[in-house]
Each structure stands twice: as C-alpha cells, then as structure tokens.
C-alpha cells in the first residue's frame, strides 16, 4: 500500500500544476477583419475607388490592323451606319491547311490502293457471273461488260500512278459510281423477290380465306342441325306436359264432383244419425219402467217399422246417384228424409204425453216392469245393429260414387 502524502505535499500540488500549465503555449486565433485606420469613412472610400481605377487601367500596345478597323466601325456607327467588316484569313493559315491535307492523303494512299484492288477482284467475279446470266438470257449486255472492264483497266492505271489529291478524288468518285450501279442492280433483284413474295402471300391469304369460309359454313350447318334436334326434343317434352295438364284437369273435375256428392250425402247421413239418437231417447223411458205395456208395445213397434222403412229409403237414396249420377234426385231424397224425421218426432211427442198421464198405474204393475226391461234391451240391440248397417252404407256409398262419375 502506498503511503499517504503529507499535508504539505497536498497543498503544494496545485502550485506545481499551475506551473506546468503556464509553460504550455497558448493558441492564438488571428482576427479575420483588419483593424480600421484612424481616418474617416468618406476619405477612405474615395481612396479605394482611385486605387481600383489605377489597377484596372493597364496600358496595352496596339500593333494589329484589326484595332484600326474596329475604330473605323465605331466612327461609322456614330454617324448612323453600322458596318461589320470581317477580317481576311491570313495566307499562311491556308497554306498550312493544304499541307496537312496532302500529308493525310499520302498516308491513306496505301490503304486505299489495297481496298481498291480487293474491290476490283470482287467486281470481276460479279461481272463474270452477270455475263453468264446475260448470255443465257440472250447475250444482250455484252457491251456493258466490256465497258466495265475498260473502266477497271483505267482505274488500275490511275491507282498505279502516285498522283495528287485530284487523281485520288476522281478514283473515289468512280468507285462510288460503280457501287451505286451495283446497289441499283441488287435493289432491282430485291424488288423482284419482294414482288414474288407478295404474290405468294396473296395466294396464301386467298387460300386461308377460303378455308375459313368453309369452316364457318360447316359450323353454321352443325349449329342448324343442333337447333332442329333441340326443337324436336322440346316438342316431345311439351306433349307429355300437355297430356299431364289435361289429366290434372280431369282429376280436378272428378275431385270436385266427389266433394259435391259428399256434401249431398251428408244430410242423408245426418238424418240417419238423428234417427238413431231418437231411437235411443225412446229406449230410455222404457228402461225406467214408466210406460204401460200397450205404450211399450206401440213404441217398440214404431221404431222397428221406422227402421224398416228407413232402410229401403236409404238404399234407394244411395242407388239413385250411382245409377243416374244426378244431384237433383239426391236433394229430393234428402228432403223426403227430413219429412219422415218430422213425422217421427211428432209420434214421440204424443207418446210422451201419454207417459205423463199413466205414471200412477206403473207403480202398481210390478210384473210389467220386467217386460219393460226386456223390451229396452231389445231396443238397444236393434239400435246398435242399425248403427253398424248405416256405417256399411256410408262406406259403400263413398266407394260407388267415383265409379258412377267416371
């Protein structure tokens, strides 16, 4: 562990540091703006303008004739006539340009000669081919071939002689003319080929148009056949639908007739039920034993007779609509049944009056009650038999009615 410094040493450290810092050089930042002089602003501005004028005015020696012409132009402009005179090109510059052109032509001369020789060989081959073609066609252009050969000989002679720029220009112009002729010939051939191609294209187009028309016709025929078949199928489907509709109408008519017949049959059946109810009512006082033997015998005979009479009437009612199929007869039969029921009710009322008068005699006659009980049992059995017969008649009537309508 380092020993702690004494208090005197601690107090001396800041002094040492300050001494070291004082030894370091202080960075100096120079001012950008110069300090003002002691003179005033007005005097200073005048001096600066004079100094600028002195610096801009520099004496230039005037030795060229162009300056003199410019001065003349300025004088003319002052008089109202502005004339611009172009300075003539010095002769030395024109001579230098000619020398440079000659040097360039001499350098390119060798290359041009080689290119001309190669072109001459190609031209000879083309000329030979053309001559063969012309001989086959009729030997019409022999003179042109000879002229071309003469022109080539002259060109070769000119190329062999090292001439000036004029001779080279002449050769270039001739080469261009020959190339133009060759290009014209090639253009003619290309035009002929293009015409043939156009003819072929037209023929191909006409052929394709015919094929397209034929395909369209075939497609239309197929569509027509398909439509006819569809119409036939639709017609066949429409017939069974119409037949089905007619059958439905017939069935509806039959159902309506059955409903009417059922309605007409209801009053008859209601009348029959009323008969059974009345018969049951008649049987109740007999069970109580409140009637005389004579009354019992008379009442028992009446419902039996009524039942016997009612049965043939019911049979006639049901048979008449089956045989004739007329609604009027059914109605009349229903009316007759109502009248019969009215007559039966009157008989029962009279019997009730007689019952009230003979209540006292019933008590004395005990033996007669046994007979009354037996008669009441017989009436119950007869009423049940009549109900079963009526149900059978109802079922038979419902089954036979549709047959009579058909």
Curated annotation (Swiss-Prot):
Entry GO MF terms: chromatin binding; nucleosomal DNA binding
InterPro entries for the chain: HMGN5, HMGN_fam
Cellular location(s): Nucleus
Residue ranges with Acidic residues bias: 188-200, 312-325, 366-376
Lineage top rank: taxon: Eukaryota
Location of region: Disordered: 1-406
Gene Ontology cellular component annotations, sorted alphabetically: chromatin; nucleoplasm; nucleus
Modified residues (Phosphothreonine): 29
SMART domains: HMG17
Glycyl lysine isopeptide (Lys-Gly) (interchain with G-Cter in SUMO1) crosslink, residue number(s): 98
GO biological process, one term: glutathione metabolic process
Family, as annotated: Belongs to the HMGN family.
Domain comment, as recorded: Specifically targeted by its C-terminus to nucleosomes in euchromatin.
Chain's role: Preferentially binds to euchromatin and modulates cellular transcription by counteracting linker histone-mediated chromatin compaction.
Protein name per UniProt: High mobility group nucleosome-binding domain-containing protein 5
Organism in which the protein naturally occurs: Mus musculus
């Amino acid at each position: 562990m380092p020993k702690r410094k004494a208090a005197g040493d601690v107090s001396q450290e800041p002094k040492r540091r300050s001494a070291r810092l004082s030894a370091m050089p202080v960075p100096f930042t120079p001012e950008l703006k110069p300090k003002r002089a002691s003179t005033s602003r007005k005097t200073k501005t005048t001096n600066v303008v004079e100094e600028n004028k002195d610096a801009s005015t520099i004496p230039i020696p005037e030795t060229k004739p162009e300056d003199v012409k410019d001065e003349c132009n300025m004088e003319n402009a002052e008089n109202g006539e502005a004339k611009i005179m172009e300075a003539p090109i010095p002769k030395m510059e024109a001579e230098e340009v000619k020398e440079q052109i000659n040097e360039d032509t001499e350098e390119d001369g060798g290359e041009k000669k080689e290119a001309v020789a190669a072109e001459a060989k190609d031209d000879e081959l083309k000329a030979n081919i053309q001559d063969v073609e012309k001989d086959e066609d009729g030997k019409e252009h022999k003179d042109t071939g000879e002229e071309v050969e003469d022109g080539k000989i002259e060109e070769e002679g000119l190329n062999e002689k090292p001439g000036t720029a004029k001779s080279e220009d002449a050769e270039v112009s001739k080469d261009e003319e020959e190339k133009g002729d060759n290009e014209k010939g090639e253009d003619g051939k290309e035009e002929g080929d293009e015409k043939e191609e156009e003819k072929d294209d037209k023929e191909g187009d006409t052929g394709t148009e015919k094929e397209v028309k034929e395909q369209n016709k075939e497609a239309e025929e197929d569509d027509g056949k398909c439509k006819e078949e569809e119409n036939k199928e639709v017609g066949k489907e429409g017939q069974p639908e119409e037949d089905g509709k007619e059958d439905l109408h017939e069935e509806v008519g039959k159902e309506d007739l059955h409903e009417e017949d059922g309605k007409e049959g209801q009053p008859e059946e209601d009348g029959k039920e009323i008969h059974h109810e009345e018969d049951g009512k008649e049987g109740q006082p007999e069970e109580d034993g409140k009637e005389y033997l004579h009354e019992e015998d008379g009442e028992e005979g009446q419902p039996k007779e009524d039942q016997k009479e009612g049965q043939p009437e019911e049979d006639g009612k049901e048979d008449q609509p089956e045989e004739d199929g007329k609604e009027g007869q059914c109605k009349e039969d229903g009316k007759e049944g109502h009248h019969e029921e009215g007559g039966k009710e009157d008989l029962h009322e009279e019997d009730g009056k007689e019952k009230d008068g003979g209540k006292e005699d019933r008590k004395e006659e005990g033996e007669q009650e046994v007979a009354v009980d037996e008669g009441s049992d017989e009436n119950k059995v007869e009423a049940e038999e009549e109900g079963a017969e009526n149900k059978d008649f109802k079922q038979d009537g419902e089954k036979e009615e549709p047959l009579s309508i058909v």
